[in-house]
């Protein structure tokens, strides 16, 4: 067993003790390396997020779409059209896509979405292009179609889509000019609130009873705790 070596040195009235361990790993070696300022200013970073489709995902989807005869020169526009459509109707796995976009060579949005789901979640794909759709909507003053149905105020209507959090995600694809404007804090709060309400309502539809005895369920098929939580939210 290796024992520490102690060195004691007296300087005037001050005594200092240095303890070293034989065979210790040097401080600047392998995983023990201590970074300096040059590293932080020159290091290369590849931003990735598990909430957003990866570049590898896009490569796979692109191959599938190419096999579906989506023209290469309008493939990006077909993706943007699909994601803009999802801003209107939603991007959950259960959402039914409507119609056919103008850039997909007659291939329906439903088929495009089905191909995406073979590789990643539709919402992950939508987040990848959220900044593109954000600029598109602002440029045309065209908010998501269902903003009123979702209970958004007029001043927050451009945040009324379920992949809004992708707008500021650094792993998303951002237009060359950048965002026309970043989302306002009030829009972020409205989007987060809408997400919370949707999740809570969805949980309220599930049966969380530990027993099917009528004394427990009182004849109800679903639980109500979550729904009641939404109704009785405390004031801000």
UniProtKB/Swiss-Prot annotation:
What's the protein here called? Answer: Coat protein
Extract one GO cellular component term from the record: helical viral capsid
Q: Does the keyword Ribonucleoprotein apply?
A: yes
* Annotated keywords: Capsid protein, Helical capsid protein, Ribonucleoprotein, Virion
Instruction: Give one GO molecular function term.
Output: structural molecule activity
Secretion signal span: none
Q: Where is the composition biased (Low complexity)?
A: 7-27
| Source organism (scientific name) | Potato virus X (strain HB) (PVX)
The similarity annotation says: Belongs to the potexvirus capsid protein family.
Q: What is the lineage of its organism?
A: Viruses, Riboviria, Orthornavirae, Kitrinoviricota, Alsuviricetes
| Compartment(s) of residence | Virion
